Amino acid sequence: MQPYPTQLITLPQAIEILLRFPQKLGWLFRGQEDSSWELLPKAGRKPFYRHARPVDEQRPASRRNPPPDLGRFNHWRELAAGYSSTLPASDFDCLAYAQHYGLPTRLLDWTANALAALFFACEGHFDVAGAVYAYFPRRYIDRDTCDLYSFSGNACLRVPPFDRRILAQHAAFVLFGDPAQALSPSQFEDELKEMNCGEMDLIKCVIPAPAKLIIHRQLEDVGMTRRTLFPDLDGLSRDFVTEALYLEAFNARDKNP
């Protein structure tokens, strides 16, 4: 098998590498603008994370005795019922619904579209390297047997498309039993040698800072924009904002080669 570089420099080269992780086989992708950021859901990051109480075998985690972030979700859910008549009945689907509307939860967004992940990795922070992660989930949420409040480990969650963004972004979520326990990727130093997708769960590919502007423009040229990923007025407006930030960063780079 031919070796592949760990760094993504151009769109054609990125596609060549990311095709090694077919979404039809279940691979998911996530792009982050800063390669140093951990793979943590928002509920596990400062200032939103609150340490859970020590485990009490007499009172295990439950809806009535939830971890701090799920207690916050319970409170949100009670109040949200007064604002919306379409709250999902399922605990898992409602958690995704809450995340969609900005609540810090123990869900981390992923996508089945590698180019969407690449877009998010190159969208900003042009002065630092970004990263695209490829993840093969070994476990999926079974709504008939899984309990949100006592869940441990990590598992993939698929939800009904309650918003057009879910469809446009080919969205999926990874649920964390402990929101402060980051996923840890395989680190490849020089080359991805003898890659065997069936044995690797999580792969990290770095995008050097100078390459982000190039890849961002190439993605726009093939129709991957904020408007396509966020098909609403907010996405349209943010597309104009992104373009302005891109031009500013591009001009700054030309002045300081």
Task: For the regions a language model picked out, list residue spans one by one.
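Catalytic-core elements of nucleic-acid end-processing and repair enzymes
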Residues: 1-257
